[in-house]
């Protein structure tokens, strides 16, 4: 064990025992880890003596690095231990195993970049040496004998084009994909790319019609010169030659490599892209004017839909810029539109997306609701004050001095004698009879009797009094009393109807 533990000594051993096994952990490296690493190296048939130097640790890491992805946890632990030991040998200050691995990866990346730069320099030198004999204008290249030859489009490129059509159909991103895959292609290569499209034959027929129209325009603008063709010169291409239907591959190569060149491949490619634009427009029937942000749609998703539809629009770049500046703000939802208008017309797309981030979320809804409730409360209070329905706080009034702002028990004025309501002495205000009458003109509550809004007595049904024709009759005292009662209560008796009651006599 002593021989195995003698890998480090002195200051290196102190530095080794200060390194933690894990970031933020309590355990640190000890001599037992070196002993374990030596035994593992012997088990894997590696020389444990390599641990004594930094170069030896580097060799061990190169051997173990290829097995890290498929190796066991013991191999990974051994690699981490050797990497940490390498940092100790190289005097690289690290605090834990993860930091040591990061340092090792950084060193390896720098070494790899230097190797790549050296290889690139060698390739550039070789290309410069052979540039006089070989042309790299793919797919038309010049061989060592100085002849211009054609290299067909690779099956991988054709397969990528077919997958794009199958997955994307004719969405706007198909056009830049076609442009990238057909870079430098001849008309024959372009026709091959169009012929391998199995489905979407209606779209292919539309594309053929567009190509025929453009070929006819080319023939109209570039008429054939009269007379024979001078010897050594090639004939001028017609529209059908550019489309690759009446020209051979050698003629196409000759036009593209002549001096001055006639880029029949680029011209044909431009016609195809024009037809693809029409097809994309047909497969994307949604107009840019119909792209509107939903009430709960995030602004980022709305911008994605907007620009995806904008790519399918057949318009110049100036018109598309105007659509972006105008319609993007105009078709946003009310919340985002308020924010975008506050930014001003010169705001960039990044500023717009940053300002509208989070619009429609819970926090934004809560803030908008709070503002709306605050505005509603303020407007209601203003309306009540305008109508005169708003009553301020009722101020208290002192019954002693008659002033407002304090109660009678807190009044500093001399104590008023008697009732505080009528000013008379002998009773208090609670017993004062001079109170405000109710709507019937009665003082309520009364001490006796029924309430003022009830009848105080029930009248009995009566008849009119009988007429008296007693000439010179003597009136008895009882008759006088009855006559007096009749005068006071004319309806309180029925004697006028039934005469003298026998029971009452």
Swiss-Prot record:
Keywords: AIDS, Capsid protein, Host cell membrane, Host cytoplasm, Host endosome, Host membrane, Host nucleus, Host-virus interaction, Lipoprotein, Membrane, Metal-binding, Methylation, Myristate, Phosphoprotein, Repeat, RNA-binding, Viral budding, Viral budding via the host ESCRT complexes, Viral nucleoprotein, Viral release from host cell, Virion, Zinc, Zinc-finger. Residues 8-43 are annotated as: Interaction with host CALM1. This is Gag polyprotein. Residues 14-33 are annotated as: Interaction with membrane phosphatidylinositol 4,5-bisphosphate and RNA. GO terms for cellular component: host cell nucleus; host cell plasma membrane; host multivesicular body; membrane; viral nucleocapsid; virion membrane. Residues 195-233 are annotated as: Interaction with host PPIA/CYPA and NUP153. It comes from Human immunodeficiency virus type 1 group M subtype A (isolate MAL) (HIV-1). A motif (Nuclear export signal) lies at residues 16-22. Residues 473-486 have a biased composition (Basic and acidic residues). The modification Phosphoserine is found at residue 154. Residues 7-31 are annotated as: Interaction with Gp41. A motif (PTAP/PSAP motif) lies at residues 461-464. The gene is gag. Residues 283-369 are annotated as: Dimerization/Multimerization of capsid protein p24. Late-budding domains (L domains) are short sequence motifs essential for viral particle budding. They recruit proteins of the host ESCRT machinery (Endosomal Sorting Complex Required for Transport) or ESCRT-associated proteins. p6-gag contains two L domains: a PTAP/PSAP motif, which interacts with the UEV domain of TSG101 and a LYPX(n)L motif which interacts with PDCD6IP/AIP1. A zinc finger (CCHC-type) spans 396-413, 417-434. The lineage of its organism: Viruses, Riboviria, Pararnavirae, Artverviricota, Revtraviricetes. Gag-Pol polyprotein: Specific enzymatic cleavages by the viral protease yield mature proteins. Capsid protein p24 is phosphorylated possibly by host MAPK1; this phosphorylation is necessary for Pin1-mediated virion uncoating. Residues 223-231 are annotated as: PPIA/CYPA-binding loop. Pfam families: Gag_p17 (PF00540), Gag_p24_C (PF19317), Gag_p6 (PF08705), zf-CCHC (PF00098). A motif (LYPX(n)L motif) lies at residues 488-497. Residues 73-77 are annotated as: Interaction with membrane phosphatidylinositol 4,5-bisphosphate. InterPro entries: Gag_p24_C, Gag_p6, Lentvrl_matrix_N, Matrix_HIV/RSV_N, Primate_lentivir_Gag_pol-like, Retrov_capsid_C, Retrov_capsid_N, Retrovr_matrix. It comes from the Viruses.
């Amino acid at each position: 064990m002593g021989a195995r533990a003698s890998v480090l000594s002195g200051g290196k051993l102190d530095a080794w025992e200060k390194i933690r096994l894990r970031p933020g952990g309590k355990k640190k490296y000890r001599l037992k880890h070196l002993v374990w690493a030596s035994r593992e190296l012997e088990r894997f048939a590696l020389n444990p003596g390599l641990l004594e130097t930094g170069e030896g640790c580097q060799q061990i890491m190169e051997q173990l690095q290829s097995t890290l992805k498929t190796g066991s946890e013991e191999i990974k632990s051994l690699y981490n231990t050797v990497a940490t030991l390498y940092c100790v040998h190289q005097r690289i200050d690290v605090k834990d195993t993860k930091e040591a691995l990061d340092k090792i990866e950084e060193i390896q990346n720098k070494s790899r970049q230097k190797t790549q730069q050296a290889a690139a320099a060698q390739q550039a030198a070789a290309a410069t040496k052979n540039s006089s004999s070989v042309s790299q204008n793919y797919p038309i290249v010049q061989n060592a004998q100085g002849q211009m030859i054609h290299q067909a489009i690779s099956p991988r490129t054709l397969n990528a084009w077919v997958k794009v059509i199958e997955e994307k159909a004719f969405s706007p991103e198909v056009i830049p994909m076609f442009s990238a895959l057909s870079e430098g292609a001849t008309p024959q290569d372009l026709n091959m790319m169009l012929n391998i499209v199995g489905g979407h034959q209606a779209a292919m027929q539309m594309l053929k019609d567009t190509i025929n129209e453009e070929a006819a325009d080319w023939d109209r603008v570039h008429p054939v010169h009269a007379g024979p063709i001078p010897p050594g010169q090639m004939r001028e291409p017609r529209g059908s030659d550019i489309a690759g239907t009446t020209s051979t591959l050698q003629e196409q190569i000759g036009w593209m490599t002549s001096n001055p060149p006639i880029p029949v491949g680029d011209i044909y490619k431009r016609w195809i892209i024009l037809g693809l634009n029409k097809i994309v427009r047909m497969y994307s029937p949604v107009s840019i004017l119909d792209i509107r942000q939903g009430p709960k749609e995030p602004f980022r998703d709305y911008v994605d839909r907007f620009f995806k539809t904008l790519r399918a629009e057949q318009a110049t770049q100036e018109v598309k810029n105007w659509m972006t500046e105008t319609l993007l703000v105009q078709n946003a939802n009310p919340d985002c539109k308020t924010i975008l208008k506050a930014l001003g017309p010169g705001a960039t797309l990044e500023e717009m997306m940053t300002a509208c981030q989070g619009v429609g979320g819970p926090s934004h809804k809560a803030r908008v609701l709070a503002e709306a409730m605050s505005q509603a409360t303020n407007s209601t209070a203003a309306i009540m004050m305008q109508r005169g329905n708003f009553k301020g706080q009722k101020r208290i009034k002192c019954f002693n001095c008659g002033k407002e702002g304090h109660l009678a028990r807190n009044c500093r004025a001399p104590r008023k004698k008697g009732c505080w309501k009528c000013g008379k002495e002998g009773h208090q205000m609670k017993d004062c009879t001079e109170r405000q009458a109710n709507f019937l003109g009665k003082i309520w509550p009364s001490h006796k009797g029924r309430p003022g809004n009830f009848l105080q007595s029930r009248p009995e049904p009566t008849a009119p009094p009988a007429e008296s024709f007693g000439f010179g009759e003597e009136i008895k005292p009882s008759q006088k009393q009855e006559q007096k009662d009749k005068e006071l209560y004319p309806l309180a008796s029925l004697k006028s109807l039934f005469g003298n009651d026998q029971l009452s006599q």
